[in-house]
Amino acid sequence: MAGEDVGAPPDHLWVHQEGIYRDEYQRTWVAVVEEETSFLRARVQQIQVPLGDAARPSHLLTSQLPLMWQLYPEERYMDNNSRLWQIQHHLMVRGVQELLLKLLPDD
């Protein structure tokens, strides 16, 4: 579903709990993994959720999602494992800001 452009995406997304991230403005983002046969995607939506205590990184080791994403040139994010994620879209979808990120293959 197409949506309207919402400007610049967040500069940073830090994991708070499994599947829940915070940006530099303390907004919460919910991330869901979408596995395809040959690649991994993350659908990340800016949804206000109550935050409990932050999870320890050691408790998140089984997640396919990174601990942190940082905005990188050319419409990409780099994660804490130095992997690049392409921004496939950054739109407002049904009133919710959404990023669709695709993990790029290692070169």
From Swiss-Prot:
Output the superkingdom of the source species: Eukaryota
Q: Which residues cross the membrane?
A: none
- The residues forming the signal peptide are none
Question: Which terms under GO biological process does the entry name?
Answer: intracellular signal transduction
Q: Which UniProt keywords apply?
A: Chromosomal rearrangement, Proto-oncogene
UniProt xrefs under InterPro entries? TCL1_MTCP1, TCL1_MTCP1_sf
Q: Does the keyword Transit peptide apply?
A: no
Molecular function terms from GO: protein kinase binding; protein serine/threonine kinase activator activity
Q: Name one Pfam family in it.
A: TCL1_MTCP1
The disorder on record is:
Detected in T-cell leukemia bearing a t(X;14) translocation. Plays a key role in T-cell prolymphocytic leukemia.
Quaternary structure and interacting proteins, as annotated: Interacts with AKT1 and AKT2 (via PH domain). Does not interact with AKT3.
Q: What does this protein do?
A: Enhances the phosphorylation and activation of AKT1 and AKT2.
Homology family: Belongs to the TCL1 family.
Q: What is this protein called?
A: Protein p13 MTCP-1
Q: Which organism is it from?
A: Homo sapiens (Human)
